């Protein structure tokens, strides 16, 4: 299966379970691994035969700006739903990294979804 990777996208969002986290934007980092058949696009050189990754990036930024999730797992699930809403995608892996999620460590969640 062919793949498109969008990695290292920094996002600011309200996320977390502690009361002090509910009133401030925090940084998370999004990585997407998108399963898609790229055979046609590799020959045609036409955007219509693939997905517009700039558009997906904008949708992820909008999700971060408008959401107020408690869990990065929930953010990852919604991000996967957005990716899978594209007809040409067949699956995706979403990785969310939350620096300083605990007092001593960075936390990372990896979620895999398929159609």
Show which residues each predicted segment covers:
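N-terminal, polar/charged subdomain of small-to-medium soluble alpha/beta proteins
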Residues: 1-115
């Amino acid at each position: 299966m062919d793949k498109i990777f969008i990695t290292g996208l920094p996002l600011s969002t309200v996320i977390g379970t502690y009361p002090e986290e509910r009133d401030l934007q925090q940084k998370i980092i999004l990585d997407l691994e998108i399963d898609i058949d790229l055979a046609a696009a590799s020959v045609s050189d036409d955007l219509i035969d693939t997905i517009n990754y700039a558009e997906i990036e904008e949708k992820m930024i909008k999700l971060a700006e408008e959401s107020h999730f408690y869990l990065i797992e929930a953010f990852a699930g919604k991000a996967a739903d957005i990716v899978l809403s594209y007809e040409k995608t067949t699956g995706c892996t979403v990785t969310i990294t939350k620096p300083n999620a605990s007092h001593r460590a960075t936390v990372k969640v990896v979620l895999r979804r398929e159609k």
